[in-house]
Amino acid sequence: MQDSHGNTQILNQANSMVKRTWRLLFRIATLILLVSIFVLSLIIVLQSTPGNLQNDINIIRKELNELMENFETTSKSLLSVSNQITYDVSVLTPIRQEAIETNIISKIKDHCKDRVIKEGSTCTLNRSPLHDVSFLNGFNKFYFTYKDNMQIKFKSLLDYPNFIPTATTPHGCIRIPSFSLGQTHWCYTHNINLLGCADPASSNQYVSLGTLQVLKMGDPYFKVEHSHYLNDGRNRKSCSVVAVPDGCLRNCVTMTKNETENFKDLNWQHNYLHTYHIMVPLKTRIINPPGSSRDWVHIAPGVGSGLLYAKLLIFPLYGGLTEKSVIHNNQSGKYFFPNSTKLQCRNSTMEKIKGAKDSYTITYFSGRLIQSAFLVCDLRQFLSEDCEILIPSNDYMMVGAEGRLYNIENNIFYYQRGSSWWPYPSLYRIRLNLSKKYPRITEIKFTKIEIAPRPGNKDCPGNKACPKECITGVYQDILPLSYPNTAFPHLKQAYYTGFYLNNSLERRNPTFYTADNLDYHQQERLGKFNLTAGYSTTTCFKQTTTARLYCLYIIEVGDSVIGDFQITLFLAA
């Protein structure tokens, strides 16, 4: 039975295969016949109407051209709509959102003023500091668009009330200013040495919180709403400040030894985050991010202000790495060096590379690899231990130094002090990936600026730019007034302002300037010739009701009758 059933299956399969073969042959024959009929018909038509063929071709071509034109028009229209949607989402929506927020703040402030005037009572909403409404939406912007042959100049320095207290004894020393201008208020801090600037053992810290208000003649003044004098025995140094909602945060390092001893000693010196909030008592906490005491011999804030970015609190850092640590091994041997257009170095490429590599390891700091970094904390949990240190690659950044972070129109920029062989201000654009709990650096772009050189020493003066190991310079941050050009080759593609010390070897001749990447537009020396000066920081803002731009320059000045160093303010418009 099994054999009979198997034979039947084979026979059925054979019959099925034959049927499929005949169907295929029939289909092929039919297709050939149809093609033949079409070809014969086409020949007959062409032979019978030879005179109309060219007309038919022209008509077809015309219709095809019209079809292509319609398609091109439709495509352009769709592309225009797509671009408009992109522009609305990425540009207009944030602007409108900011305008709505500004309007709400303005209405709240006006409401509070009316209540105080009409009822004679205090307005609880007034507990939160708010700038005068004429300045709202005038902060952290690019105020110009670069145009060839256009120069930026300020007309005059303004007389206005000073908001920074000065030294009160002949040997008092006030140094290291840090200033942060937020959307609702500003924060300021500086260090005070009672026994002169050379005293490393003890110091106090001043912090103030205030708002921008308007004088009767229309110019701004910096009104101090709250201030605090920290005199608790802790020797705070290198404090960076940032304005946060309803308060200020400062990142400081507490020192028990001088700077060179800190880089030599393996005993970790803690960083402290100080909360100065108008609603709550002063709080302090130790910052101890994962691996910090293992990877770093010493780490300090960058002095310049930090920033708020997408609910993250970010401070500049720099310090010395522990030899053979994970970060040290990752960064060792990496280097970055730009070539100066103005101060050309005649060294060979190999000599430049060797000098650049050597520049990261500083003999003065016990041979430590000196690294820049960023402290990142969740603003919503800044009273916890929840912080992390981000390490920028030295493939794209020069040797670690003091610095400042800017958030300008949602772009992060980082100023790095010229502490090594490069004499000019270093400015980088930083891009972050925010997809995880803490961000990761995805891009670092250097902007080559060749104005405002820092004073140096005989090994690395302010008028030379060959890569080599040295330690020198001074903190002189630079403020971009238009979007900095990070493309190569670098051209005159942005405007800047600040103070610099116009001396290649000594901290003398503080000079105010406006400039582009390569040339000054305006320079004005402060005070007498060879005046001693030091750190400087610059912040600009616009009075939106008058469209007038103001820039605040905060600078350390020596040679004072009272105090070794004072902090002096200038306001230009």
From Swiss-Prot:
- Enumerate the subcellular locations listed in this protein's record, separating them with semicolons: Virion membrane; Host cell membrane
**Coiled-coil positions:** none
Q: Which residues lie on this side of the membrane: Virion surface?
A: 49-573
Alphabetical GO biological process terms: symbiont entry into host cell; virion attachment to host cell
Which top EC class is named for this enzyme in its record? hydrolase
Q: Which GO terms describe its molecular function?
A: exo-alpha-sialidase activity; host cell surface receptor binding
Is Nuclease among the key words of this record?
no
Its UniProt entry gives the catalysed reaction(s) as:
Hydrolysis of alpha-(2->3)-, alpha-(2->6)-, alpha-(2->8)- glycosidic linkages of terminal sialic acid residues in oligosaccharides, glycoproteins, glycolipids, colominic acid and synthetic substrates
Intravirion side stretches:
1-27
Where are its TM segments located? 28-48
Give the source's domain of life in one word: Viruses
Keyword field contains Transmembrane helix: yes
Q: Which residues are glycosylated?
A: 258, 330, 339, 347, 433, 502, 530
Protein name, as recorded: Hemagglutinin-neuraminidase
The encoding gene = HN
